[in-house]
Amino acid sequence: KYSDGSIEVKLPLDIKHKECVNIRAVITDVSGILLLTYVLEQLQCMGIKCKLDLPYLPNSRQERSQKTDSCYKPNSFLSFARILSNYKTIIESITIIDPHSEDNISLLELLGLYVNVISIKDIFPLDNFQNIDYIISPDEGARKRTSLIATLLNVPMIVARKERNPDNREIELILNTELDLKDKNILVVDDIIDYGNSLHDLTKILKENYKVKRISCFISHAILSSNLRLTIPSRT
């Protein structure tokens, strides 16, 4: 970075001889979006095309404008999508792993971008999960991707649900099933883990109420905010 905090971008000199380059952008914060924009702008100025590997789609959970009791929350994914569309003449393709929402992909395509989606079943390490008895989706939003893995493993699927507690307004995770899960091996599947609240709550329910034997988890994208790497072992 420069002394004022601006991002410094350096591209190799021999890039001028390229007709098309591959870009892998693992974006973890807003500065990554800005850095990608700078690179795309330079490539466009030089007339160089690119294939963009974007494993995690930034702002994908902020895909709707919202009005709360205290503020407005903008559709920040729309802003990011429009940034990418500014460079659609040089972006030959965008490859994304297990996107959070199909609507996000539809928007990118509507803006003239070609998107290659890698499904969760294409990255799932099948050999690592051969002794699973049940697969659980932590909510309705994860049902489709969880169903894909359940089909791969040929095991039953259970879908939990989230409800807002009217007393404290907090989101609570509920698992209602009459299945006997005692001493069973459970696999939880989701696309994103951030603070880990859903995983923590589901694990607690499975251990305390259903006496399961073992809980495994497969997540496509690990955000792991708030130092979650250190807190997950003690919480589960």
PLM features per residue range, with description:
Residues 1-236:
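PRPP-associated nucleotide enzymes
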